[in-house]
Amino acid sequence: MSDTINLTRRGFLKVSGSGVAVAATLSPIASANAQKAPADAGRTTLQYPATQVSVAKNLKANEPVSFTYPDTSSPCVAVKLGSPVPGGVGPNNDIVAYSVLCTHMGCPTSYDKSSKTFKCPCHFTEFDAEKAGQMICGQATENLPRVLLRYDEASDALTAVGVDGLIYGRQANVI
């Protein structure tokens, strides 16, 4: 007695097609019964710390004040520009803050009082302090990260509460 099966091409296609049809029929039933993962599965939401930067009355026009935010390895600067700007806070809506790390290669920028820009000495990128850190010229492809400030009229305190944009060299601003 021989244990071999004589299968023709036509027979093979019929058996294979039947198997595919059964799998296609059962697949939606199995996926309907599968447990759905929550929409935010695998995501972690980290809160920015609230850190007092300065008191508004202590800031002088075009005199940058250094601080670190959201942690001690992130140098930032707050500047009173002297005229109201979009996103500005304080009694005259003229106080802004930025990370000083250039978004191109992470070199520290410096504030230029005459042009109200942040200039990177490494590759000559310039960022406009009056226009939300917008890149004016140079190698960077992103604006300078803006530190979000909250102003409390009662205490005149300026508090950093977040960052708009990714600080150079990070996958997330809060670590």
Swiss-Prot record:
The lineage of its organism: Bacteria, Pseudomonadati, Pseudomonadota, Betaproteobacteria, Burkholderiales. Residues 1-32 form the signal peptide. Gene3D superfamilies: Rieske [2Fe-2S] iron-sulphur domain (2.102.10.10). It comes from Alcaligenes faecalis. One of its GO terms (cellular component) is membrane. Binds 1 [2Fe-2S] cluster per subunit. Its cofactor is [2Fe-2S] cluster. Residues 62-158 form the Rieske domain. This is Arsenite oxidase subunit AioB. Involved in the detoxification of arsenic. Oxidizes As(III)O3(3-) (arsenite) to the somewhat less toxic As(V)O4(3-) (arsenate). The keyword Ribosomal protein does not apply. It comes from the Bacteria. The keyword Transmembrane helix does not apply. Belongs to the AOX family. InterPro entries: AioB/IdrB_ssu, Rieske_2Fe-2S, Rieske_2Fe-2S_sf, Rieske_Fe-S_prot, Rieske_Fe-S_prot_C, TAT_signal, TAT_signal_bac_arc. Predicted to be exported by the Tat system. The position of the signal peptide cleavage has not been experimentally proven. Heterodimer consisting of a large and a small subunit. It catalyses: 2 oxidized [azurin] + arsenite + H2O = 2 reduced [azurin] + arsenate + 3 H(+). Its EC number is 1.20.9.1. The gene is aioB. Keywords: 2Fe-2S, Disulfide bond, Iron, Iron-sulfur, Metal-binding, Oxidoreductase, Signal. Disulfide bonds join C107-C122. Pfam families: Rieske. [2Fe-2S] cluster binds at C102, H104, C120, H123. GO terms for molecular function: 2 iron, 2 sulfur cluster binding; arsenate reductase (azurin) activity; metal ion binding.
